[in-house]
């Protein structure tokens, strides 16, 4: 069976049981995302993060290959993540794993969307694969 050709990979991640202190810290999230871009072999172009009052952060890192974005709810230990990349150089799954580790997520629901699958000359579609993971069984990060 041959590999399906795609223009890009889009990871949509529901991260739960995350460290609320990290989720409420825009500067720390920026550091994590910039390093995640490196880990995922992406070229950073720009970034912007906004801290809401009293809590929560929204932010984006623009990479040459597309973007990494987040919206957090520290009071719920929840983060909504998107990692989208085009081309063959980037490794978005490594960026996702790095972010989940640094957020200390205990649980993740991940959808991988292969985008831009060409059906014919003018038509494109996508394919979705979804999985769930229990990442940590206790609070110290060890299974």
Swiss-Prot record:
Pathway: Amine and polyamine biosynthesis; S-adenosylmethioninamine biosynthesis; S-adenosylmethioninamine from S-adenosyl-L-methionine: step 1/1. GO terms for molecular function: adenosylmethionine decarboxylase activity. Is synthesized initially as an inactive proenzyme. Formation of the active enzyme involves a self-maturation process in which the active site pyruvoyl group is generated from an internal serine residue via an autocatalytic post-translational modification. Two non-identical subunits are generated from the proenzyme in this reaction, and the pyruvate is formed at the N-terminus of the alpha chain, which is derived from the carboxyl end of the proenzyme. It is an enzyme of class 4 (lyase). Binds 1 pyruvoyl group covalently per subunit. It comes from the Archaea. It catalyses: S-adenosyl-L-methionine + H(+) = S-adenosyl 3-(methylsulfanyl)propylamine + CO2. The keyword Chloroplast does not apply. The keyword Translocase does not apply. Keywords: Autocatalytic cleavage, Decarboxylase, Lyase, Polyamine biosynthesis, Pyruvate, S-adenosyl-L-methionine, Schiff base, Spermidine biosynthesis, Zymogen. The active site is at 66 (schiff-base intermediate with substrate), 71 (proton acceptor), 86 (proton donor). The modification Pyruvic acid (Ser) is found at residue 66. Heterotetramer of two alpha and two beta chains arranged as a dimer of alpha/beta heterodimers. PANTHER family: S-ADENOSYLMETHIONINE DECARBOXYLASE PROENZYME. NCBIfam families: SAM_DCase_Bsu. This is S-adenosylmethionine decarboxylase proenzyme. It comes from Thermococcus gammatolerans (strain DSM 15229 / JCM 11827 / EJ3). The gene is speH.
